[in-house]
Amino acid sequence: MEQGAEDIPVVYLHDIKRQYSQGEATLTILDGAKLALWAGQSVALVAPSGSGKSTLLHIAGLLEHPDEGEVYVSGAATSALTDAERTQIRRTDIGFVYQSHRLLPEFTALENVMLPQMIRGLKRKETISRSKEILSYLGLADRITHRPSELSGGEQQRVAIARAVANAPRVLFADEPTGNLDPHTADYVFNALMQLVKATQVAMLIATHNMELAARMDRRVSLQDGVVVELE
């Protein structure tokens, strides 16, 4: 990508190819996939199970290497980066939310949100203040001392969202974030994500089967034969 371009996507996938061995066969999951994610824009990735949604998210989030192609973050190529450099980008620029909240059970809601900030090297006083602010924004001000087992499914997922945005990432990836929730709770969690996108101008890519939620996002894309296609 040209560094001098006026508008540069937060993340840009260029000609991504990813294959896996399946016995003696080779399974091609992504084959020349391209996708640009822009600041303040929400994108729904809607595709059948096994089509490569999670693989695409993992490659875009620098959790997995493509076999071919390039992942650009803020205009900079990442293929030649060391594992340590990729980890640093994930800590500062990328947030993840999964279908399962993946909160640490021995920590309170507040401590779970503080953790990524502490790992980044921020001072404890600062992390406490910011974590309380985010949890309050997500309607959890009275739940900060509760451990995950003491929270409802929707509350657990909102804590997971708070943790994902704790370091003010530039892009947020969510893999079926409402998949384990009832419709009412799913709607509440989805609205929380959308509010954060608009408030912080983070770019967001959500893999989802929920067409109703996908329809409320800025863009909708799918995977067909390993290629990203725009949907109406």
From Swiss-Prot:
GO terms for biological process: lipoprotein localization to outer membrane; protein localization to outer membrane. Its EC number is 7.6.2.-. The keyword Translocase applies. Part of the ABC transporter complex LolCDE involved in the translocation of mature outer membrane-directed lipoproteins, from the inner membrane to the periplasmic chaperone, LolA. Responsible for the formation of the LolA-lipoprotein complex in an ATP-dependent manner. It is found in: Cell inner membrane. One of its GO terms (cellular component) is plasma membrane. This is Lipoprotein-releasing system ATP-binding protein LolD 2. Its main location: membrane. It comes from the Bacteria. InterPro entries: AAA+_ATPase, ABC_transporter-like_ATP-bd, ABC_transporter-like_CS, ABC_transpr_LolD-like, MacB-like_ATP-bd, P-loop_NTPase. It is a peripheral membrane protein.
